[in-house]
Amino acid sequence: MALFRALYIIWVFLLIPLFNAEEFTPKVTRTLSRYVFDIVNFDDSNTLIRADEDSVEISFDAGENWKTIDGIEEPIESFVVDPFRGHDRAFAFVKTAPKFYVTDDQGKSWRPLTIPISEKASNYFCGITTHPIKKKHLIIRCDLLTINDSGVMHVGREIYTTNDGVSFSQVKPSFGKIDGHISTARCDFIKSSEDSDLGGNDASILCLFRNTEYIESTGSTIDKSELILSADGGETFKELVQFKDKVVRRYEILKYHVVVLTQDDMYNEMSSMDIWISNDVCTFQIAHTPTKIRHVNMGQIHEDSIGRIVLSVSRERDDEDSNQPGAAEVLISDSEGLKFLPIKWIPNNQFGYINVAYPGFLKGTFFGSFHPFIEYSDRKRKYSRQKVREETKVSVDNGLTWSNLKVVDRENVDSFGCDVTKPERCSLHTYFYDLRNLRPSAGIMMISGIVGDGSVYDWNEEKTFISRDSGLTWRLVHNSTGLYTTGDLGNIIMYIPYRSNENGDVPSKFYYSLDQGKTWGEYDLIMPIYPYRLISTISDGSGSKFILTGTSITDDPISITYSIDFSAVFDYKSCEEGDFEDWNLADGKCVNGAKYKYRRRKQDAQCLVKKAFKDLSLDETPCNSCTGSDYECSFEFVRDAKGDCIPDYNLIALSDICDKSKDKSVLVEPLQLIKGDKCKTPMKIEPVDIPCDEIPEEGSSDKEIVTTENKFDFEIKFYQYFDTVADESLVMLNSIGDAYISHDGGQTIKRFDTDGEKIVEVVFNPYFNSSAYLFGSKGNIFLTHDRGYSFMIAKLPEARQLGMPLDFSAKAQDTFIYYGGKNCESILSPECHAVAYLTKDGGETFTEMLDNAIHCEFAGTLFKYPSNDDMVMCQVKEKFSQTRSLVSSTDFFQDDKKTVFENIIGYLSTGGYIIVAVPHENNELRAYVTNDGAEFAEAKFPYDEDIGKQDAFTILGSEEGSIFLHLATNLESGHDFGNLLKSNSNGTSFVTLEHAVNRNTFGYVDFEKVQGLEGIIITNIVSNSEKVGEHKGDEQLKTKITFNDGSDWNFLKPPKKDSEGKKFLCDSVSLDKCSLHLHGYTERKDIRDTYSSGSALGMMFGVGNVGDRLLPYEECSTFLTTDGGETWTEVKKGPHQWEYGDHGGVLVLVPENAETDSISYSTDFGKTWKDYKFCGDKVLVKDVITVPRDSALRFLLFGEAKNMGSGSFRTYTIDFRNIFERQCEFDITGKKRADFKYSPLGSRTDCLFGHKTEFLRKTDEKCFIGNIPLSEFSRNVKNCSCTRQDFECDYNFYKASDGTCKLVKGLSSANGADICKKEPDLIEYYDSSGYRKIPLSTCKGGLKLDAHLAPHPCPGKEKAFREKYPINTGAYALVFVTILLVIFFAAWFVYDRGIRRNGGFSRFEEIRLGDDGLIENNRTDRVVNIIVRLGLCISLITKSAFQRAKAGTAQLSSKFRARFGNKKGATYSSLLHDQLSDAFQRAKAGTAQLSCFKI
C-alpha cells in the first residue's frame, strides 16, 4: 500500500506541470496601429519605443499600454539604443532632415540635435557610434540621397564627430572632392568595448575613406583610399603610413585585434585582398591565408571566445544581394591572428556554402553547416539528387573535433525518413540562421531544420527542434517553422508558426513551453496575424514578457502588436536553491584550459528564476594539466592528415626564424600554447630541427616568391581558365575522369564530387565567360555559370553521348544545343544517327529540334545585321547517306525549314561571317559566304599559275572586315602548303597575300596575327616549294612578317649576337640568306599557345634559329621581341616554354622537354633574367599557363616527377606578387605623376595604316600593372596621308616585282557590275583601278591608287543614272563661250600691242630675234614682244618643215610611180595612236615605280 501511495504521489507530481500549463493563460494585450516599422527596448527595463507611421510611441509596461512621445514631430527613420548605455540612452533619427533626437532617461524626455550637413539632400540616412566609456563622444555618419533633374540618384557620405551635440567637426579625406564618388566613409572608436585590449588611448578614432572613379571608356574603375587615425577624439588626423599606397577595402575593430583588408589591385574591385592584423593600432602585419581572399562578407569578421579571428569568405563581395545562403568558406586564425586556416570537416574538400555560428555565452561551442553549390530556386529544386551531401555539425572544443547533430526522440522516431540511431547517416541539418540572435540560456536552444542523410534539403519539409545540451542532441517539437524566442533564461519558450497549416493559412495562435520544451501550451489570438517579429522585452533573456508584431490579413492591412506576459505563471513563484542544477559545457571537459558550468532551473521545477535584468552567470575552473587541445601549431607549422604539426616551408620562408640564425638549421617548437588559455601545467614540447639552407635569404627576391605544390596520382589532361577578371578560376580534368576546380590559379585545388560519375568532357561557353559544362559518363551534365562556385545538375536526353561539342547562343546564356545519338545500341548501327536537342532553360528541359543534325549555329546571334534574329543553321547528314546539307529555320524547325545547300562538306562561323564549303565538279571545293544568313555569295579566289583545283582550304579568322583563308596548293602528306588569301569587306573577293605558306595534314597553318597590334602577321613559307612539289627535296621553311596586313612581307631581322654575346655564324646583308626563323602553329602541342599576348603589347616569344632556313626544334633557341617583331633578341639557349604575366611585366621561361627545378623570369621586359628554384626535385614541366588575359601575377606549372611513385604528377603555383614594392600609378588624365608613358613600338616613328600610334608602357620595374587595360589606352597622335603601304592589290591583280599591282595575264578585273546584282538599289558602278584600300587603314588624302574611273550605269538604271549625272548644256556653253572670249581678248591684246603698233603683219618677216626695232615702253611691252618673237619662230619652223615635207613627199611619190607604175597605192595609217601609246606606256612605267614612295 505504501508503494502504491508513493507511485501515486510521483504520478501526480509529474502531471502537475501539465495541469499548470493547461490552466495557466498568459496575459495578452493587443494594440492596433497604422504601421509599425521599428520597435526597440531599453536594457534591464520594461520600457519600449516604437515608430508608427505618423508618431513615436513609448510603453513603460512591456508593451501593454502605449502613448505618443511629445516633442518628436518629424517622421522617424530609425531608432538606436546605445549599446553601452542601453538602460537609459537612445537616439531617434529623422528621415527628411539631418537631425536626431536623444533621450538619456528611457524616453521620458528628448532633446533635438541638428547635424550641420554641408549639402542639401532629399533624404538622410544617419547612424551613430557611441563610446564605451566616454558618454559624450559620438560619431555620426550620414548618407545623403539626392536626385537630379534627370532622375539620376547620387549618394553622398559625410562623417562628423561631436561632444554630445555641443559642437560638430566634419571628418574629411585629404583627397577631397575628386572624380567619382566616396563609396566608403566610416569612423569608429578604437576602444570597441569596456574590456578592449587594444592599445591607444580612449579618444582614438580610426576612419576610412574610399573613392571609386569610373572610367567610362573601358568600363573599369579606379579605387583610392585613405585610412586615418586620430588620437584626440577627432580634432586632428594622420594617415597610417603602412597603407599610404594601398587601397583599403574595409576594416573591423574587434576586442583583441584590428583587421584591415587591402585590395591588391586598385583597378579591379574584384581583386584579391591582403589581411592586415594589429593589436596596438600602431604596427600591422600581413596574415597568412591558404589562398588569396577576394570576398569577405560584410559584417562577418568576428572573434570567438578565445580571441581567434573568424572570416566568412563569400564567392561574391556583396553577399547581401545574393540568393544563395551563407559564405563559401570560413577561415579561422590562430590566437595571434596571423595565420588563417579553413574549417577542415567539409566533405571531400568540396565547394559549397558554409554557415558558422558560435554563441558567445557557450564557450568553445561552434555550429557549422555545409551546403553544396546547387542553386535553390524553385526552378531547380527538381534536381535534388545532389552529388554532394549537406553537412551540419557541432563542436564543443573550439572546432578541434566535430560531430553530427544527433536526434534523440523516441516519440517521433517513426516520422523521420531514416534511422536516427545512426547519426553518421541520419542527423539534423540546418542553416543556423536562428542562432545569430539567440538569447542567453544554459544550453537551451531551438532551430529549424530537416532530418536526413543530407542528400536533399527541401525547404517545405523544415520542422522545429529543441536542444537542452547546447546542440549535441535534438528533439522535434513542431512540424512547422516559425518565430521563436526564450525568456527567464530558457525556462519560457514562445513559438508562432509562419503558417498554421499546409494551405498557408495565417496563424491564429501561438505556442509556449514552461518546462524547457518538454510540453507545450497554446493560445488563441484575437486576430490572426502574419508574424514578422517575436522578441523578449529584456535583451539578456532574463525577462518573462514578450512582444509579437505583425500585420493583419485584411483588405486594408494594419499593424498588430501583442504584449504577452508570463510573470504570473506558477502563481508568481520564484525558484529556490533546490530547483536548480549544474549544467556543464562540453560534457564537463576542459575548454580553453578550463571547465565551465551554469546553474539552471531543473526542467520540471514549478517556478521561474525571476532574476530579471541579471545576466547569465558562468562558473570557470582552470584545468590543472595542459593537453593537446590547449595548443595550436606554431606559425611555421601546419597540421597534416593525422593532426600532427609539420613544417611548412612557405611559412618558414615568410617568418624570420632562419634570418635570425647563423646556423644551417634552427630548432623550433611545433606547438604553441593558445593565447589566453587557462590551463596551469604546460606540456613538454619537443623542438623540430628546421634546415635553413633551402630558405631564401632576407632581402632576396626569391624570398618574396611563393610556390604552392599540389600532387596528383593521375596526369592532368585538360585544363582551362575562365576568362574573367573576377578571379583566377580554372577547371582541370585528369586521365581517369576526375574534375578539379581552383579559384586561385591552382594554389588550392578541390575535387568536384560527382558521386562516382566520371567526367568525359568539359566545354566552355565562348560567349559567356563564367559558364562551363561538365559531361558525366552516366548521362548527367553539370552546369556552372559562376566559374565553378556552384553547379546545377541536369539530365541529358535519353540518347547516346556522341562527344560532339555544344553549340551556344551568343545572346542567351541558358540556350544551347546538345547532340545525342538515337537508335544507337551500337555506335556502328546503321540506324544510329545524331539528333539536335535544344534547351532554353540551361538544361532543365530539352526538346528534340532536328533529326540527323550534326552541327548547328545560332546564326541570328552571330551577324551584325541578321536577316532574322532567331535564325538557326544546321548541317544535316541523313541516315544511309554520306551527303550533308545545310538547312535553316527561324522557329527552331517547328514549322519553318529551308534548304540552303543540298550538298556541302561543312561550314563554320567567324567574325560575323558564315562560310560554307560546297563540293564542285572534278573533286574541287567552292566557298560561299554570308554576313546576314539570307544571301550567300561565292567566294572568288584569284587566278594564279600555281592554284589548280580547290581541294582544301582553311579559314584562319576574320578581323577588321576581312577573312583570311589558306588555299592548299599541295596536299601531299608531310609536305603540305598553299597560298594565303585575304577577302574584301563582305568576304566574297579574295586576293593572294603570300605563296607556299606552310600547313600540316590536319589543316593547321603557320599563320599568326600578333595580338593587340594592327596588321602584324607572321607566317612560315616553304622556300623550295617547286622542288617539294616535284618530290625533289624536303621542305625548307623560312619565317616572314608583315606590318601592313599582308600587303608587304619581309624576313625577320636577326639579332647581331646570341644570348652569350657571340656573333651568329651567318652575317649576310641579304635577309634571304641570313634571317631569323621560328617554329610555328603547325608544331604546337597546345593550339592555345601563341607567340604574342593581347595584353603584353609588342612582345613575342618564339623558338627558332638564325640562318638561311628553319632548323629542327631541338636545335633551336628561344627569342624575344618587344617591338612587335621589328627586332629580336636571343634570351635562352635551347627551346623553352613561355608565358606572360602582368601585361608583360613578368615574363617566365621554362625549359622544354628537359627536367628542371628552376624557371627563369624577367621583370624588365626581357632585358635581364633571373632564375628561381621552385621545387626540390627536378620535374618535367609539360606546360606553364596563367589567366587568358595574361594580367595575373600567378603562374601554374604542370609537371611530372618521374620515378617517384604515387603523386608523381604535380602542379606548381608560383606567385610573384610580393616581389613588387607597389602598384603602378596610372592617371588617365595625364595631370599627375604616373608610372606609364606613351611611346611608339620600336624605332618605327612613321605612319602605319594611315595613322601614327603610341602605346602605354610602364617605366618603373618595381611596380606591377594589375588590371589596368593598357591596350585600351593606345592613342593616335597623327592622321596621315595615304601612301603605297595603305593599298593592296585588287581581285585578279598581283603584286609585281616593282611593287605595282598588275592584271594577271589573260584575265580581266572583277566585273564591277556584279555589285548591282547584290545591291539592287545602286545606280552606278565603277571599274577597278587594280588597287583597294586596306580595311585597317584610316589615311586621308595623299596617294589615291584606288581612285575609280568614270561611273557606269547599272543595267536597267540608265534613266536614273542620267538623272543623277545630267548633261548640263547651258553650263558647257557658258564655259565654252568664256574660253573663247579669253582667247579672243588675249589675241587682240597681243595684236594691238605687239603687231599693229610695230607696223602690222607687213613687218612680220622683218622681225629678227634680238631686233631692237620693236617698241618697248614698259614691262608689258617686253612680254608682248617676247610672245610675238616666239610666235614668229614657231611660224617659221612650221613653214619650213611643211615645205621640206612637201618636197620629200613629191620626190617619194615620183619614185613610187616610177617603180610601181599605175598600181594602187598603200592605205596610209596615222602614227599618232602608236606614238601616243608608246609614250603612255613609257610614262606609266615611270610613274609605276611606287615602291620608291616611303611612308
Curated annotation (Swiss-Prot):
Its main location: Golgi. Gene3D superfamilies: 2.10.70.80, 2.120.10.10, 3.30.60.270, YVTN repeat-like/Quinoprotein amine dehydrogenase. Residues 1391-1495 are cytoplasmic. The keyword Manganese does not apply. It is a single-pass type I membrane protein. It is found in: Golgi apparatus, trans-Golgi network membrane. The chain crosses the membrane at residues 1370-1390. Glycans are attached at N148, N479, N769, N986, N1279. One of its GO terms (cellular component) is membrane. Residues 1-21 form the signal peptide. It holds the Pfam family Sortilin_C. InterPro entries: Sialidase_sf, Sortilin_C, Sortilin_N, VPS10, VPS10-sortilin, WD40/YVTN_repeat-like_dom_sf. One of its GO terms (biological process) is Golgi to vacuole transport. BNR repeats lie at residues 58-67, 101-111, 229-238, 394-403, 465-475, 511-520, 740-750, 837-847, 1119-1129, 1161-1170. Keywords: Glycoprotein, Golgi apparatus, Membrane, Protein transport, Receptor, Repeat, Signal, Transmembrane, Transmembrane helix, Transport. The keyword Iron does not apply. Residues 23-1369 are lumenal. Coiled coil: none annotated. Belongs to the VPS10-related sortilin family. Present with 319 molecules/cell in log phase SD medium. Functions as a sorting receptor in the Golgi compartment required for the intracellular sorting and delivery of soluble vacuolar proteins, like carboxypeptidase Y (CPY) and proteinase A. This is VPS10 homolog 2.
